[in-house]
Amino acid sequence: MSKTIVAPAPAKIKAIGVGGGGCNAINRMVREGIRGIDFIAMNTDAQALTLAEAPTRVQLGEKLTKGLGAGGDPKMGAKAAEESRQIIEEVIEGADMVFISCGMGGGTGTGGIPIVAQAAKEAGALTIGVVTKPFAFEGGHRSEVAEEGMLNLSSKLDTLIIIPNDRLLGLCDAKTTVDSAFKMADDALFHGVQAISGVVTTPGLINLDFADIKSVMKDSGPAWMSVGQGSGQNRAAEAARAALASPLLDVSISGAKGVLFNITGGTSLTLFECNEAAEAISQAVDPRANIIFGVVYEPKMDNEVRITVIATGFSSQYGKGAPNLEELRHLMKNGETLDVPSFLRRGQYRSPSQLVNTVKGKRDFVPQPSKISRQ
C-alpha cells in the first residue's frame, strides 16, 4: 500500500514598515520583487500612506491624529498604534515570522513599533525588528528619542537588528549623494530580509528551514546582520571578510552565541569555496557558538558570491561595539580594507534597478468617513 506524504506548509512571513522610514524600506522590497513575504505599510500620515506600495496599508490612529501624522512625538505614535491595535492584530494573524522596520527617532515609528512588535509576539510569531539610528547631525534630541525607543522595543521582540545611519559614512566617498547613501541602508535591510526569507522559502544545496532560523533568533535579543559580496578567484572568502567587517552594523560578531549565514552564488560555486567562507566566519565567533548555514544557487550570480551573516546572543543589550581597525587586521589584504564588497571599493556602486511591480489586490485599512475600506 502506498502512502501519500504531505509536505509541510511553508512558513508564513510578513514584513511591516511603521512610519515614514519603515514604509520606505517596504517600498524598496516590493520593487525588488522579494517573493514569499506579505508586505504591510503602517503610518499615521494618511497622505504619505497613499504613496506606500505594500499590498496592505494601515492608517494608525485615524481618530487621534486625523491623518496628519504624530508630529514627531513617540507618545502620540504609541497612542495611535494602540487605537488601531485590533486592525494590527488582524493583519498579523497567521504569521510564523514577522519583520518590523522603522527609522528610530521620529514619532510614528518610534512610538508605534513596540505596539506592533508586541502584537506579533503575542500572536506567536518569531518577531524580528530591523531599525535605523539617526545621523548625529539630526541632533541630540532625536538621538535620545531613538535610544529610549530602542530600550522600550528590545523587550517586545525576539531579535533587534540596529543599523546606525552614521556608519553609512564608511560606505561613501566624496561623490556619494544623500539619496544614494540612504539607498545603501535600504540595501542592507533588503538583502538581509531576502536572505532570511530565502532560507525559509527556497530549497538550497544545503537547506535551512524555519526551525533553523528559530533556533538562532528566538528570544536572542540584539543581533548583528551584514551582507558581503565578492568576485573573482577568492570570491567566497572575500564575501565573508566583507560581511564580517561591514561598517553599517552596530556590533562585532566576536561575542555572538548564535550565527546563521547564507551563501548565494552561481552554479560554479564549489564546496571548497563554501568551506573557505565557513572557516572565516567560524574563526571570528565564539568557539561554542551555534553555527548553521545554507547554500543557495542563483543563476544570475555567475562569477559572484553573496554572503549574509546574522549573529545573535550577545551578552550586553546592544552587543559589543563595532570592530575597529586593529580587531580587523586579519581581514586586510595587501593593505586594502575589505570592509565593503569589491564593487563598492572600486567605486562601481549602483542601486539595483527600480523594477516597480504592479501590485494587484491592494488591501487598505485607511478609514473612510463611515467605514474601513479594503480593496
Feature annotation, model-predicted:
Residues 1-375:
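Tubulin/FtsZ superfamily GTPase core signature
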